[in-house]
């Protein structure tokens, strides 16, 4: 193997680019808000499925991202806009209390358990963790470093990043115990506002990039 091609600085930079885009530390309150109704076992399962899904999503994006988008004629900017809209819908449900009501209904047996389980993939894994920014960055990274060695190194980096996120989310129950039910309800609405801003940023970034292509 060519040692020069296997440059570890590439993977360190890739890891920190994912860290900056995803901001897993800032995701802890969001994860806590979305899983505070779950038992410890359910929360750990959600955490595992979410981060395992993130590893798969980013790995697929790394290997097949450009091909898939081109195959369906979808631009990264369009994907960013659609992801922003989805984040905004989730944020609205958190702000107006529907998300909390769904949690209470689930506790009373009125909500399908599949709905509660599905948050591990949507919205946690995508678009909140593996969002348009992380996916598009991964695709761009694969175009710059397309050798087999670098693709393999980036895949290992993705696995390590997912394990890092899993570790951070693992300690989230401590936050739940400290804040209590009232604190979680307040934080849920605050996180809804932040998610609303994040969704708007996704949409504006996609629109700005799209407009720059035409003007």
Swiss-Prot record:
Positions of transmembrane segments: 10-32, 52-74, 78-100, 119-141, 151-169, 190-207
A Pfam family reported for this protein in Swiss-Prot or TrEMBL: MarC
Primary location recorded for the protein, binned into one broad class: membrane
Keyword Metal-binding on entry: no
Keyword Membrane found: yes
Subcellular location field: Cell membrane
Bilayer topology annotation: Multi-pass membrane protein
InterPro entries membership: Multi_antbiot-R_MarC (IPR002771)
GO CC, alphabetical: plasma membrane
Keywords, sorted A to Z: Cell membrane, Membrane, Transmembrane, Transmembrane helix
NCBIfam families: NAAT family transporter, PRK11111.1
Family: Belongs to the UPF0056 (MarC) family.
Protein name (record): UPF0056 membrane protein bbp_248
């Amino acid at each position: 193997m060519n040692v020069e091609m296997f440059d570890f600085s590439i993977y360190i930079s890739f890891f920190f680019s994912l860290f900056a885009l995803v901001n897993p530390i800032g995701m802890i309150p969001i994860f806590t808000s979305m899983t505070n109704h779950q038992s410890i076992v359910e929360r750990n399962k959600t955490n595992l499925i979410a981060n395992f899904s993130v590893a798969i999503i980013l790995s697929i994006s790394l290997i097949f991202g450009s091909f898939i988008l081109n195959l369906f004629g979808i631009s990264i900017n369009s994907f960013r806009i659609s992801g922003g809209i989805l984040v905004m819908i989730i944020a609205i449900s958190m702000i107006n209390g529907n998300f909390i009501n769904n949690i209470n209904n689930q506790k009373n047996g009125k909500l399908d358990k599949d709905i509660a389980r599905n948050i591990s993939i949507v919205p946690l894994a995508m678009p909140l963790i593996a969002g348009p920014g992380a996916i598009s960055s991964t695709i761009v990274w694969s175009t710059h470093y397309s050798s087999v060695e670098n693709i393999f190194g980036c895949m290992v980096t993705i696995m390590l990043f997912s394990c890092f996120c899993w570790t951070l989310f693992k300690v989230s129950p401590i936050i739940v115990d400290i804040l209590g039910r009232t604190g979680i309800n307040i934080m849920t609405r605050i996180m809804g506002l932040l998610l609303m801003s994040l969704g708007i940023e996704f949409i504006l970034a996609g629109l700005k990039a799209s407009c720059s292509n035409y003007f």
